[in-house]
Each structure stands twice: as C-alpha cells, then as structure tokens.
C-alpha cells in the first residue's frame, strides 16, 4: 500500500529502521569509543578529548540550526539525509585515519598540537555532517511522514533505536577494541 507521497509502507519502515539504527550506532560509537581511540592512538592527553567534545558540540549545534532552517525552507529532507549520511561516513573514515598523522611519537609539543588540531577538526566536521544527515534530514523526514494512524508506531521505533544502538555499539565496539590488543599500549 502506498502513502499519499508514493512511498510504500514496507519501504518506509525499512528506511525508518535502517537509517535510524545506522545513525544510533554511529552516534554511540562516536560518543563511547572515539575518546578511547584518541587516548590510545594519538596521545594520552585528555585535553584533546575535552576539545573534541566542546568543538564537536558547537559544530553540531551550528549544523542543526543552519541545515534545519535550510531544510525547512526548501523541504528537501531526503537530500539532507542522503548527503549528510554520506559525508558523515566519509569523515568518520577521515577521523580514523588521523592515527597515521602520528609518525613515531608526539613527544614534541608542536607535533602534538598539530595532530590534536587535526583530530579535533576531523571530529567536528564528522559531527557537523552527522547532525545534517541524522538530526536534520532523517528525523525531519520521519516527522514529515507522521500522521495520526502511525504516530505511536513511529514513536516506539524511534524510542527503541537508541537502546539497540547502545547495545550494538557497546558490544561490537568492545569486541573491536579488545581484538588483537587494538588499543592496548
């Protein structure tokens, strides 16, 4: 059965669950494991992590206001979600590649500063596009498809996804971190 916008019911729910779970797992991995990555692969300096948290929170807030307004004006939620998720994925990979900026050691303050800035910038850009894809694009798109007959089902799906994302992110992330002594120094 197709809705008034031409989206089949099955396709709608596949998108709600697929994109929703993907977004929640990504946010969980970022919030739970990226500080471990920085501490183990970049430097045992909590200042970098503090800067990551502050700058990425600012970037996410700016993204939310900027792309939220743009999305409301032009109404292209699918475009926002698609572009945001793709760029989010690319910059998540870029963030992981920052470990290769450390060539041997970060014992000199100038090297540590340069690598720290690169890590913070990669995290902020990644979070910026994550907010564009998930918070602005996906959540607004789901809201556009909400009506009285499906509002409870959508609410239940969206409420369940962070729990599933946290469980999967914690278990899968823990297995990856623990395998082959990835983060043990």
Regions found by a protein language model. Give the residues of each.
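Cytoplasmic helix-loop-helix junction between adjacent transmembrane helices
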Residues: 123-160
């Amino acid at each position: 059965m197709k809705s008034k916008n031409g989206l089949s019911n099955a396709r709608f729910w596949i998108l709600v669950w697929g994109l929703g779970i993907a977004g929640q797992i990504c946010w969980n991995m970022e919030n739970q494991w990226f500080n471990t990555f920085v501490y183990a692969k970049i430097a045992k300096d909590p200042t970098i992590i503090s800067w990551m948290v502050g700058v990425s929170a600012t970037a996410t807030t700016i993204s939310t206001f900027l792309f939220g307004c743009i999305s409301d004006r032009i109404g292209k939620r699918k475009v926002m979600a698609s572009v945001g998720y793709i760029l989010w994925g690319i910059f998540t990979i870029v963030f992981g590649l920052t470990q290769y900026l450390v060539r041997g050691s970060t014992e000199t303050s100038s090297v540590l500063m340069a690598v720290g800035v690169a890590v913070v910038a990669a995290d902020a850009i990644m979070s910026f596009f994550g907010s564009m894809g998930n918070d602005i694009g996906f959540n607004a798109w789901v809201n556009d498809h909400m009506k009285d007959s499906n509002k409870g089902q959508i609410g239940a799906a969206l409420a369940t996804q962070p729990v599933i994302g946290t469980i999967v992110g914690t278990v899968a992330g823990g297995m990856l971190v623990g395998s082959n002594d990835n983060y043990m120094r």
